[in-house]
Amino acid sequence: MALLEIIHYPSKILRTISKEIVSFDSKLHQQLDDMRETMIASEGIGLAAIQVGLPLRMLIINLPREDGVQHKEDCLEIINPKFIETKGTIMYKEGCLSVPGFYEEVERFEKVKIEYQNRFAEVKVLEASELLAVAIQHEIDHLNGVLFVDKLSILKRKKFEKELKELNKNPKSKS
């Protein structure tokens, strides 16, 4: 397994619309394994392939259990996801491995139902709520070239741009 480089905002790569996966082979399995290792090493709970430079419609989510540990057997590998159903709305404070050090509330669907494939091309259906639903929406947005900062109000977006400018001027201040 290998640690992959996470691409940071404002890289144009993050705006790429990812392509559907048709080949479920050992290369894909290795990419998924490398993505999980990278996500865990970066202390994230989700990672879309485009965040490591792979324009493929796949993502992983590994929420920690109550003990705070992200168990490998809980890792969701979601390939070629499609929303089947969405319900309600909630505000949730989000962050992103591609936008380090910035957290802000974003409006999301409260519940989602998706259809996807696993690493073996088996079709699955998943119903999710709360943090899992938010993480799924956040990562699927990445597959469509959308970042959570795109969903901010004008005021919050200006705050983000200002913080980003400060961080770039003074990179050590926010680590």
UniProtKB/Swiss-Prot annotation:
According to UniProt, the name of this protein is Peptide deformylase
Q: Name the species this protein comes from.
A: Helicobacter pylori (strain Shi470)
Q: Belongs to which family?
A: Belongs to the polypeptide deformylase family.
Tell me the classification of the organism that encodes this protein.
Bacteria, Pseudomonadati, Campylobacterota, Epsilonproteobacteria, Campylobacterales
| Keywords assigned by UniProt, alphabetized | Hydrolase, Iron, Metal-binding, Protein biosynthesis
Which InterPro entries does this UniProt record tie to the protein?
Peptide_deformylase (IPR023635), Peptide_deformylase_sf (IPR036821)
GO MF term list: metal ion binding; peptide deformylase activity
Give a yes or no for keyword Hydrolase in this entry: yes
The record, for SUPFAM superfamilies, names: Peptide deformylase
Some GO term, biological process aspect, for this entry: which one? translation
Q: Which cofactor does it need?
A: Fe(2+)
Q: Which gene encodes it?
A: def
